[in-house]
């Protein structure tokens, strides 16, 4: 067994929210285009009434994926700790909030749920017995600007070591190990009327040495000194949040606890290589380690562009398939 490919429907946010496809039609199109077999769904985005899952939806969903020969790989669940305006959720409330979503994952046949940092390590700790009972693994998504050793991540790693449960794991997001800011993002800034000099200033700090917080603060200070508006400063700062520069080889450190992967991507060059993420380098880390699980192709360009996602998903699968097939033969 080896790394298996799939798609998260989050990649198709514009197609779904723009009413170009129903949920059922999206799933069918994923299968038709050969960008499965793994299927990742974000609960609150795709399932009406979530986390309550009706028996009818359960029946229809299972029939749908069986008909199209797809496999449930991961269910994206939310922490939503600030869902109330007056206060944040208590730990007890958050545990119950997560348990309902984990139960939904089990009901629909998802073996993994994607969890978020705001849940906090204590909530994750208390969820372990429930996850073990329902046979659903908890995968904390490591997403830029966090790293494996950031203040966000270390408390979870320490708790994982204490609890030592196979149902606690991680979901690496490849945007954390980017090598460049993709053209889609640069073009979006230009279309918004941001001067290229301002974009170049942000890029110079993004590519500099140092911790992400220091580089981001350095850019913001320089941008304000240069007279850029607060709106432009905030827009350009987003590149520091979405794209990290962690070395791909660092993923090996948590490999035994990786339960799913988000194969983040944006743009391709004329040779079919992904511009922002060095896929030959990053996939080699997982293939060399013998990772046996799914990677969801995750196109996030819909934040910046209305360009259709299906063709890009096909390119991403073609790239990753070639790397998987060629592994060990170089």
Predicted feature residues:
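Aromatic-rich peripheral "rim/lid" segments of glycoside hydrolase catalytic domains that contact
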Residues: 285, 289, 296, 300-330
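Short amphipathic alpha-helices and their capping/turn segments at secondary-structure boundaries
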Residues: 24-31, 54-69, 154-166, 245-253, ...
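Catalytic domains of carbohydrate-active enzymes, especially glycoside hydrolases
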Residues: 21-44, 103-112
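Active-site beta-loop-alpha junctions enriched in small/polar residues
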Residues: 8-14, 42-44, 77-80, 118-120, ...
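Gly/Pro-rich active-site loop or hairpin
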Residues: 12-23, 52, 149-153, 180-292, ...
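Active-site acidic/histidine proton-transfer and metal-coordination neighborhood
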Residues: 64-71, 81-172, 176-220
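Hydrophobic faces of well-ordered beta-strands that scaffold small-molecule active sites
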Residues: 3-9, 37-41, 72-77, 113-115, ...
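Glycine-rich, proline-tolerant flexible connector loops at the mouths of alpha/beta enzymes
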Residues: 37-63, 303
């Amino acid at each position: 067994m080896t790394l298996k490919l799939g798609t998260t429907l989050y990649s198709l946010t514009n197609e779904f929210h723009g009413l170009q496809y129903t949920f059922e039609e999206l799933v069918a199109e994923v299968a038709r285009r050969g960008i499965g077999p793994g299927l990742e769904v974000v609960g609150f985005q795709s399932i009406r009434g979530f986390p309550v899952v009706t028996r009818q939806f359960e029946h229809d969903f299972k029939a749908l994926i069986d008909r199209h020969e797809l496999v449930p790989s991961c269910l994206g669940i939310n922490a939503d700790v600030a869902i109330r305006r007056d206060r944040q959720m208590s730990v007890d409330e958050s545990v119950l909030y997560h348990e309902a979503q984990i139960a939904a994952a089990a009901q629909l046949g998802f073996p993994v749920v994607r969890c978020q940092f705001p849940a906090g390590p204590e909530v994750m700790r208390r969820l372990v017995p429930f996850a073990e009972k329902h046979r659903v693994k908890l995968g904390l998504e490591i997403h830029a600007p966090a790293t494996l050793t950031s203040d966000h991540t270390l408390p979870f790693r320490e708790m994982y070591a204490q609890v030592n449960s196979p149902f606690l794991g991680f979901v690496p997001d490849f945007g954390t190990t980017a090598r460049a800011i993709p053209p889609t993002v640069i073009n979006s800034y230009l279309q918004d009327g941001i001067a290229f000099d301002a974009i170049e200033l942000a890029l110079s700090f993004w590519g500099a040495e140092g911790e992400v917080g220091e580089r981001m603060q350095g850019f913001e200070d320089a941008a304000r000194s240069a007279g850029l508006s607060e709106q432009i400063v905030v827009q350009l700062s987003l590149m520091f949040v979405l794209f990290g520069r962690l070395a791909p080889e660092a993923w090996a450190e948590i490999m035994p606890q990786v339960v799913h992967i988000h194969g983040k991507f944006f743009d391709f060059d004329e040779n079919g290589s992904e511009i922002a993420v060095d896929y030959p380098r990053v996939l080699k880390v997982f293939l060399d380690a013998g990772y046996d699980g799914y990677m969801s192709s995750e196109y996030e360009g819909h934040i910046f562009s209305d360009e259709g996602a299906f063709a890009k998903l096909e390119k991403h699968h073609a790239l990753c398939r070639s790397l998987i097939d060629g592994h060990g033969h170089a």
